[in-house]
Each structure stands twice: as C-alpha cells, then as structure tokens.
Amino acid sequence: MISMSAKIGVSTAASMVSQAIGRLGTTVEQAGEMGRTWEDRSVRVIVAEKYFMRIGSFASLTVMVSGDAESSRVEAVASGAGDGLLNFNWGARQDFEEDFRRQMRDLGYA
C-alpha cells in the first residue's frame, strides 16, 4: 500500500494520478473514476488495471485522492494478479504499486 501527501490540490493531484497511470506501460488501462465533494473537501477514486505477462493475469490498482484545494493525500493499493490455487502473484502487485509511486514522484508529487 502507498500513502503520499503533498501541498497540491485534489483536482491537480487527480490529474497527476491519471498521468502516472498512463505512463505505466502499454498494458495499463484506467478502468474508472468517481468522486465526491462536500464543503471544501473532495475525494476521488481512480481504478486501473494492468496485464502482467509473467502471471498471465491482470492486477488492479485502486487509488484514492483526498483533501482540499491546497493539499492532498494519495493512497493506492494493488490487488488481484494471483495465479493458481495458491494465488501466487510473483511480485506483480508490489511492482505495480512501486511503479505507480515512482511515476507520481517523477511528476512532482512527493
């Protein structure tokens, strides 16, 4: 699981998340996005999936962006990507999360 905070508003952070997802490779697709706003706070949830050849399966990445117009928190967790009866993922989930973290940092979200 990833948790990052920055002095970046929720709308900008959500755009950065979409950009980061787009940079994760040709087998990544943003599956959906939803959001809610109340008073001065917002929450955006973005879901992506990526195909991993090493396991012949998809992993999903669920990202939650929360905060206000001045600061935000990005939290993400990868799931799925298991293979076989024992659900081995051969590091696919960890790689998906770490690749996403790296892309967010490269875009300036620390």
Q: For each of these PLM feature ranges, what is it?
A:
Residues R41-A48:
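Short, hydrophobic/aromatic-rich segments at coil-to-beta transitions
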Residues I21-V28, A81, G108:
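A common structural junction motif
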Residues R54-W90:
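Beta-strand/loop substructures that line and gate deep hydrophobic ligand-binding cavities in soluble
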Residues E39-D40, F52-R54:
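Acidic pyrophosphate-coordinating catalytic loop
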Residues I8, T12, F58, G91, ...:
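Conserved active-site and cofactor/substrate-binding residues in soluble primary-metabolism enzymes
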